[in-house]
Regions:
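PP2C/PPM-type serine/threonine phosphatase catalytic domain
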Residues: 1-131
Length: 131
């Protein structure tokens, strides 16, 4: 499998609030890991929220060694959500920040995907398909 990612600021925004992570190599218990986060437009510090959420998820994922990846995903997302919320409460410049979050891992030809918000995941097998 080959992975590819890119972001584009678009025509309306002055700050790119997108953040990507993708690895075809193992990250903790994940045989591979692909994440897209997009800070919520109009919310304060969306760029910080997206980068913080992705980096925190990867940091936590690296510590997971034994559990099945699809069992870990939801727990890690809940921990990341709590961490983003706590940061937004502690520091005034981050008050109200938020982000979308899409993560996927492929285990034995099965994709496990989680999605919070309106970011999209696409699958390509000769045709581009939105998941």
């Amino acid at each position: 499998m080959k992975s590819f990612g890119m972001t584009d600021i678009g025509r309306k925004r002055k700050v790119n609030q997108d953040y990507l992570f993708f690895s075809d190599e193992p990250i903790g218990c994940f045989p591979n890991l692909y994440i897209v986060a997009d800070g919520m437009g109009g919310h304060k510090a969306g760029d910080k929220a997206s980068s913080y959420a992705v980096n925190r998820f990867v940091e936590l994922a690296k510590k997971e060694k034994k559990e099945l990846p699809f069992l870990v995903m939801e727990r890690l997302l809940n921990e990341v959500n709590e961490a983003v919320y706590e940061l937004s409460c502690k520091e005034e410049q981050y008050a109200g920040m938020g982000t979308t979050f899409v993560a996927a891992t492929v285990v034995d030809k099965t994709a496990y995907i989680m999605n919070v918000g309106d970011s999209r995941l696409y699958y390509f097998d000769g045709k581009i398909r939105q998941v």
